[in-house]
Amino acid sequence: MPHFPNLPLPEAAAAAAHAALLALALLLLLLRSARALASRCASCLKTAPRRAAAVDGGLAAASSVGAWYRAALACCGYALLAQVAALSYEVAVAGSHVAVEALLLPAVQALAWAALLALAMQARAVGWGRFPVLVRVWWVVSFVLCVGIAYDDTRHLMGDDDDDEVDYAHMVANFASAPALGFLCLVGVMGSTGVELEFTDDDSSVHEPLLLGGQRRDADEEPGCLRVTPYGDAGIVSLATLSWLSPLLSVGAQRPLELADIPLMAHKDRAKSCYKAMSSHYERQRMERPGSEPSLAWAILKSFWREAAINGAFAAVNTIVSYVGPYLISYFVDYLSGKIEFPHEGYILASVFFVAKLLETLTARQWYLGVDVMGIHVKSGLTAMVYRKGLRLSNSSRQSHTSGEIVNYMAVDVQRVGDYAWYFHDIWMLPLQIILALAILYKNVGIAMVSTLVATVLSIAASVPVAKLQEHYQDKLMASKDERMRKTSECLKNMRILKLQAWEDRYRLKLEEMRNVECKWLRWALYSQAAVTFVFWSSPIFVAVITFGTCILLGGELTAGGVLSALATFRILQEPLRNFPDLISMIAQTRVSLDRLSHFLQQEELPDDATITVPHGSTDKAININDATFSWNPSSPTPTLSGINLSVVRGMRVAVCGVIGSGKSSLLSSILGEIPKLCGQVRISGSAAYVPQTAWIQSGNIEENILFGSPMDKQRYKRVIEACSLKKDLQLLQYGDQTIIGDRGINLSGGQKQRVQLARALYQDADIYLLDDPFSAVDAHTGSELFREYILTALASKTVIYVTHQIEFLPAADLILVLKDGHITQAGKYDDLLQAGTDFNALVCAHKEAIETMEFSEDSDEDTVSSVPIKRLTPSVSNIDNLKNKVSNNEKPSSTRGIKEKKKKPEERKKKRSVQEEERERGRVSLQVYLSYMGEAYKGTLIPLIILAQTMFQVLQIASNWWMAWANPQTEGDAPKTDSVVLLVVYMSLAFGSSLFVFVRSLLVATFGLATAQKLFVKMLRCVFRAPMSFFDTTPSGRILNRVSVDQSVVDLDIAFRLGGFASTTIQLLGIVAVMSKVTWQVLILIVPMAVACMWMQRYYIASSRELTRILSVQKSPVIHLFSESIAGAATIRGFGQEKRFMKRNLYLLDCFARPLFSSLAAIEWLCLRMELLSTFVFAFCMAILVSFPPGTIEPSMAGLAVTYGLNLNARMSRWILSFCKLENRIISVERIYQYCKLPSEAPLIIENSRPSSSWPENGNIELVDLKVRYKDDLPLVLHGISCIFPGGKKIGIVGRTGSGKSTLIQALFRLIEPTGGKVIIDDVDISRIGLHDLRSRLSIIPQDPTLFEGTIRMNLDPLEECTDQEIWEALEKCQLGEVIRSKDEKLDSPVLENGDNWSVGQRQLIALGRALLKQAKILVLDEATASVDTATDNLIQKIIRSEFKDCTVCTIAHRIPTVIDSDLVLVLSDGKIAEFDTPQRLLEDKSSMFMQLVSEYSTRSSCI
């Protein structure tokens, strides 16, 4: 800083500051000019079009300027005029004898204000949205200096310094400029110029320049494209002041932010870079030390050590400068006592205080932002590693880790490891802080500081058992949370079956029981933390008492300055000591999470050599399996498949058949490499496509599911739609192939999902197609059409292996494999196997028995749809590409209707979605959310008690510090004001009393938080379980899981403590202001405008921060959903070789999540920096006032106490605003939970005054009266006035084409969908007038998709625990599973894995039949219940139903005609209307009936047998 001799210190400081700022402005101007010159030189090498683009990308002229901008210019001009007038007056009065010193200040200020005016005027010309940072800082500094000089001039006028000559001209100019400078200070804080801009492109963002305007979008970037965050390329000043974030906050202050407003992460900060770095270091350890487990912590440290080192440097500087204030307090008190060592000592001390606090503020913000960025890197990299592992898990590993657990690894464990970045440097900072504290204490209390060291070590040692206790509680808490999340995920995925079976209350109670267990461990963890808080709040007091007591016992002399210096040191040391339990707890939590993640990452993967893949065409054998044995459980004595030898020539069609549980699906899995291979070899030639038996559909639209990552080829896409019989379905769907099909394809029927799967496989144009029973879910006509168009035509030149239970599809195969008990018992062509007899003959005979039941005229073929038997079909086309002519010739003008939606405008398509966008509030969080939360537990009575406890703590703390400052002598040699014993006793009483109130407050907050969290969880859970099925159809399960996991965890562990922390910080801040104002009331002059400025900045910040947090919550759901979805479909993803694409998608979603997270964290630091800078200037003002008082005017000990508290003003001020902002951000989780607490509910489960009799329904008579159903109010009717009667005790078959309304009718019967009109009457009871539980518990259903819950066979058959073991065994025997279950070691307690993966689809269906047998309902509904079993098993199930449900009303939806041919009545639906309803015999007599056509199609398809 320049030096100006012979000037009073305030004037000299002002002149020096203006000169320095003017020099900095000129330097930046020169640098910018040089940069512009270099840019122009570089642009000469670019093409003319690029230059033209750069010109076109410029800004238009400002359309208008605001009143504030004009006022700012006027104030600058006014200040310049005042300084010029003062300078002219000095020259005019003194003439040639004028002193240089007298002209120096007005001359420098005149030059400075001229420069400021020029820069401010340039804002309109250049189009700045915000004033440059330097200009704004200049205005603020000028106002502070003006206030300081005005105070000094006031002392002159009051006669404090009679010997000094008063410069009245400068005094008048300074006073006259004060209002203008005050206004400019306010404008500088706000920053906005008020200039409204019109851009030539779509970019409407406002940028904040450093000096001469920020750079707009690069000229070569497309208009409207997302820019990379300027964080990595920002200059030093922009980085130090975090001004690079101001453009985003400016946009957020004008309108709610959207994801598109948030800049992209820099390449080095993206998930891909983090994942590559961590994964490479982790794998390197694995290779270098093959016998030992790699260290995940070491891989993280190796990947990000540079960031950790930079953060460590900032942390070290911050720690050192934070002790400057406590070190200098004793000198400051001595100065106020009259002990002046050198001239201007007071101002120099004040300047050192100010610079130290300034450095502390700047380094803290860089340090905190650095650890935030490092945490994002760690979380992104770890999440990607967990996701990649989830895609590669072997079957045994997959069984030990459910999808819910894997999601929890990502949602909880990865989060904790990332959060540890905040605590990483505390390990070495604590010893450094202790060393610095001991050095200061040695200066003040001498050798007594040894006792400080001992007391500190004892305090730290006391944490060791606490750490073990915390680790134990964390283990238990995480285990219970895993269990709850696993069961929650399972319930959400299977909510339909829970509602159909009236089990939702039972499973909800199970979840609440699990939550109670979780709360037990949570309660212990939080209450133990409250005890730890008491211990560590008491530790600094304990250390202070020991230190002062030892000093007195050793005969040392305590002074007010020494005591205040020690207290300030203890206060700083208190932070790391108070955070030490958090550090211990975080280390314990991180260690647990690292162990869990390491254990997961070490799990066995699918071996790369499970199958040997060679290029297509390199051999004529497409698939070759030699002497192979496979087992899903390698430790089982009985392998799943054994002695498998199979050779498939390229282009061959191979059919696989056999009874349920024979190993058909496992054979396909062995070719894919999914099932562990015990011996032998599997070799495939070329790429493969896999269609599983249970459809796996992503939650995107139909088009995205079919393309599956491949580029769009419109002609090929149309041919695929045609081959998969999807054209009519897409025409019927309101939004065509742009329909969002919901979580797991829930908005499509079973047949539609299967055909979308087939289309996905066909579009990939693979070499080998593995199809697992693809035709079971479609009707006979669609199945026949699919087989002809798909397998015989589109895949004519491909190698196809298809599993089927439908015998009619076997004759067309080149090779038929018959499986039984895991062995290929027969292999050959159809006719050869028929002649051989045995197992294959049994399957065919069962099929013929079913066909023989259909007695109708042989000549009916002539009157129905003609169709060539499949066996005699000779493919006339070689592959899908040859379908082109067929599609083109048959295409009608409406054929593209189903796929034309993509041409509509994005805003139109956004409205046309079957899945709701995630609800997101906008604007401020409602006060009602806070009030509702605070009143949730104990009716809010704990809130005033918490405030009272915190107030008492603050009062007692201030009292204890005041006592020590007052009771001790001011300087050495003065007599003490009280006895040393009284001194210590009073201090200990006050200090320990304050820590006791902290303990009480912590207990109250923990109690309040637990009770509130539990109430909100139960309320949300009950509302979710009572939500209508349409909510689950349109809401991905990952989105709901996000509320019950992430948001609930925030409520459990954070919200209450944020609320308590805000109250605590508010009271502490009021205490600091009270102490400072008591000593120097002049501080209130700046406190009030500072508070106004803080509130304005808080509102400016919170407008963006609130939306960033909401965007963050919304962006979290897709990450969780992709996890769940990918893990469920991992086999399909691997079967298509799509692991890389899904990994890329995961990395993209992680970046979408990281963008708002990074901006949100940076915004916090942006606000904190400005808050702390303001409070630092207030502290400096206070110091300047104190040093300006003549000696003896103020009591030194009280002034020292004010400084001691003032040292914490910046931290408390920023923490106050920050705590409120974080509370507002976190309270969004409460807001999101309340959204789910207000979900629309289904009808009541029980209506007490309208309950049916216990024996209802007695007859099972069902009457449909003008039944009309639509799925949404804005959608067309699905059922159009259905009226018919299903007589009680009769067997009703319900048939129709795909999409005819069969499943909708069943949903209306169970009231999953409430009718739009009409009614359903069962035994004279209108079902709309009784409770849902009364209705659904009296009906029974075997659904199309068999659902098993994780647990045991017993639990799946009898979840309500109403049946005896004997009754369960009888049901198992009747459904032909008794022998299978008895062969298991655990019998009825045999385990069922997630989704029933360890049981075949057919076995799952039989278990569902067992449920129906145990329920013994009078009405039974079968919704495609036998689609996944072979014909023999189908016949068996039908016999069981005829015998066991002979007196029941049985409604059967089926695509297999033999399943319904022996029904008493057949209902034929078409387009939601009744086409026919009569006995099968009468319908068959009418050759033109639709039922006759369906039977004819099925018979024709089967006529080759």
From Swiss-Prot:
Residues 904-919 have a biased composition (Basic and acidic residues). Disulfide bonds: none annotated. It is a multi-pass membrane protein. Residues 623-846, 1262-1496 form the ABC transporter domain. InterPro entries: AAA+_ATPase, ABC1_TM_dom, ABC1_TM_sf, ABC_transporter-like_ATP-bd, ABC_transporter-like_CS, ABC_transporter_C-like, ABCC_6TM_D1, ABCC_6TM_D2. Its main location: membrane. This is ABC transporter C family member 13.
